[in-house]
Design a protein with these regions (language model features):
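Bacterial N-terminal signal peptides that target proteins for export
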Residues: 1-12
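C-terminal segment of classical bacterial N-terminal signal peptides
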Residues: 15-25
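Long alpha-helical, hydrophobic tracts
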Residues: 22, 120-210, 435
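Accessory, solvent-exposed terminal regions and/or long lumenal/extracellular loops of proteins
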Residues: 26, 30-40, 181-422, 426, ...
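Short, compositionally biased low-complexity segments enriched in polar/charged residues
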Residues: 33-50, 135-147
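Surface-exposed, glycine/proline- and aromatic-rich loop segments on solvent-exposed faces
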Residues: 49-113, 170-191, 196
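Loop/turn elements at helix/coil->beta-strand transitions in domains of secreted/extracellular proteins
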Residues: 56, 155-159, 429-430
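A cross-kingdom signal targeting lumenal/periplasmic-facing segments of multi-pass membrane
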Residues: 87-154, 335-342, 346-351
């Protein structure tokens, strides 16, 4: 049995997990050294959906780039939204969820194989068997078949709630009223109009934006009650020339969320890869994701993380505290909250968080031809934990004078080659390029593990 020594790396964020010695616990042990967060993707949108029963709190991160006066957001919603159901959320809350659930890189260091096994065993601390889950416009609207259901201001946003009889009239109304929507919106608006959905329309109030002191637009958060558990993404495809990335964080009191009208596939995980990837993790993850995306014919949602939010192992960021969970839209923590209230009042006693929030992180790369329908979600009671996790295993570089050390040394070339093959398969990178890079990572063991293999044997 191989024994491993684990140490902290300071590449990005270093968070201490639990020292793991028991083989049955190795699946989620190690130290976090890097993460593949949403910043890897230039056009990645992020959405939080907190869902319990038929109640949803939808938080939309605002990744708009350009002059704020040109900003317009049109979101189909299943019901008329009132002012008290809308708020602006702290921008940091999306970043916190992203950091907490991002795919991660962990590393291990082989211990000295010559250390007597019994002594190591006696000194090792067993890992737990299970982790604790620890006005004029209104007149023209009627002519166009558009009804203004509500009009109000929240934070830096002016918001209008619309219903429409036909998509052409809705498109005309939006353009006449100064909402700069892309050409071709009529075709994509039509299915939502036919299904009786309403439209949440927002633009920036420049005076209030300047008063706010913020440099960027804050996330909008909407609460509503509906049996429909969908995420309308088709409007985002109007001007898309390439595939777009969407990161969805679903928060539930029950367990994992899944998509019912598209397959959900776990992102490749728990792979041992060469140690040089530590300095190229962003490139690695982008290549690996694209390879898996093409392999699945570009029409699946990828599960990147699923976990009870009261714990993590290893932790890429600290779990969210109760106040942060509320900011993310979680409304069921306070047992005294009324079913009639879209959000729990902040004046109530702080809730006690146990295992009552489960996060599912889904990564969808979509195009109009492969994702013709909006994803439909459902909550499940499945609390199986999963994370995108990639393992670096550093070889022992000290002096080896025992039989176990010689056997360990003999096993390394095969291990390195397996890591190279795994990396090539995951990323579609050239195997020869991988081997050349690995030559620089073996360090003090030798200058070229495949070129000097026989010289290793000579010294045995």
């Amino acid at each position: 049995m191989k024994r491993f020594k684990i140490v902290i790396s300071s590449l990005l964020i270093t968070v201490l997990a639990v020292l793991c010695f028991a083989p049955t616990a190795w699946a989620f042990c190690g130290f976090y050294v890097a993460k593949a967060d949403s910043k890897l993707y230039n056009q990645a949108s992020q959405v939080i959906m907190a869902r319990d029963g038929d109640r949803t709190v939808l938080t939309m991160a605002n990744d708009f780039q350009g002059e704020v006066k040109d900003f317009a957001m049109v979101v189909p919603v299943p019901t008329v939204i009132k002012k008290e159901q809308v708020r602006v959320a702290p921008p940091k809350i999306v970043e916190r969820l992203d950091a907490f659930s991002a795919p991660r890189l962990v590393e291990y260091f082989d211990s000295d194989p010559c250390v007597e096994y019994d002594r190591v065993l006696n000194e090792a601390v067993p890992a737990p068997a299970a982790r604790a889950r620890a006005g004029a416009a209104r007149g023209s609207a009627s002519d166009l078949g558009v009804t203004v259901e509500a009009r109000f201001n929240v934070g830096e946003y002016d918001i209008v709630i619309l219903s429409a009889k036909e998509s052409g009239g809705l498109e005309t109304w939006l353009n006449r009223n100064g909402y700069k929507i892309p050409r071709g919106a009529k075709q994509l608006l039509q299915p939502y109009v036919r299904s009786g959905m309403k439209f949440f329309v927002a633009k920036v109030n420049l005076d209030k934006f300047e008063e706010s002191g913020y440099q960027f637009l804050r996330p909008l958060q909407i609460s509503y009650q509906s049996r429909k558990f969908i995420l309308p993404i088709r409007l985002g495809m109007i001007n898309a020339n390439a595939a777009q990335d969407l990161i969805v964080y679903v928060l539930s009191p029950k367990g994992q969320a899944e998509i019912t009208n598209y397959r959900t596939v776990k992102v490749p995980s728990d792979a041992n890869i060469p140690v040089f990837v530590k300095n190229e993790f962003s490139d690695f993850y982008k290549s690996m994701f694209q390879t898996a995306y093409l392999k699945e014919d570009r029409k699946v949602a990828f599960l990147e993380y699923a976990w009870d939010m009261s714990s993590c192992d290893p932790c890429s960021a600290e779990p969210l505290n109760p106040e942060e969970l509320k900011q993310a839209g979680v409304f069921w923590l306070d047992n005294n909250s009324s079913n009639d209230e879209p959000f729990p009042p902040s004046s109530r006693r702080p809730p006690i968080v146990s295992s009552s929030v489960f996060i599912t992180r889904l990564h969808i790369r979509y195009t109009r031809d492969k994702f013709p329908e909006d994803p439909i979600f459902q909550a499940t009671s499945n609390q199986e934990s999963f994370q995108g996790r990639y393992i670096l295993q550093h070889p022992f570089t000290g002096e080896l004078k025992c039989q176990a050390g010689r056997e360990y040394k003999r096993s390394l070339p095969k291990r390195f080659e397996q890591e190279a093959q795994t990396l090539a398969k995951l990323t579609n990178w050239n195997i020869q390029d991988i081997r050349r890079k690995m030559k620089l990572t073996v360090g003090d063991l030798n200058s070229s593990w495949w070129g000097n293999f026989f010289s290793w044997l000579v010294g045995m």
